Amino acid sequence: MPPMKRFICLLLVAAASVSGTHAQRVTRDIPYATPHERQVLDVYAPAGAKSLPVVFWIHGGGWQTGDKTMVALKPKTFMDAGFVFVSINHRLLPTVEMGAITRDVASALGWVHRNIAAHGGDPARLLVMGHSSGDQLAALMCTDDRYAKAEGFPLTIIKGCVPVDADTFDIPAIIEMAETRARVHHLPLPTYGHRQKFGDDPAKHRDFSAVTHVARDKGIPPFLILHIAGHPDTTAQARRLAAVLQAAGISAKVVAGRETTHSSINDNIGAANDPVTKELFAFVADALKK
């Protein structure tokens, strides 16, 4: 069996394992920025870990709720496969504005780059992933290199990006679609929808959109964009981001989860025989070759 196929098979076997045999440890509530109860992260690592690739996970919750403990099978799945897994919290709307949230995520990435070696991770091999609102943040961190530069690390340490079912890679487009739909169907507009969450300013809407920042020769990593097959908005946004990435010469694959929901496509990552998990680990194996 060729070495890369063997590596993918080993990853998939580990991902499907329900009960790992290796000792694992978790270090919780590590501050990554100024003292705020939300500016903390958890590090999950196999015992004796050394220079392992790192999965950096951002929870969902509409930027208003959610927690770093919302990880389901992921920590064990990735540790069993030979990864360090990091899950972060960030401050939330409406207590802070969106820019504070994006800076929190960048600060957490900076902390990982500077400190993850002490936890057995390789600071030069990160995979950035997130669900729902977390994948808008993940995609932005992987395309807008101002965040990496502000934290003092090159974008090239991020070897892959995996957004899981979001509709906000192109924020002006989703705002227009949602508001047009409301007008056509005579529905009330939300009082705190995407327009308001992202600052009620078209310039900010563009700036918080991953598609705005895609360009050649920035070190943008390959993308695996996961979405549920049954939702037109996340489907359209996944295809939009992939098209922009591919036009810039950046590898991007879109995978639609069949018979899944917004919650289950996320919660089932790591489950035995989950098709999305198989796609994910095949992508990871390929991304880490580069």
Regions inferred by a protein language model and the residue ranges of each:
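Alpha/beta-hydrolase superfamily serine-hydrolase fold, recognizing
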Residues: A15-A16, Q24-K290
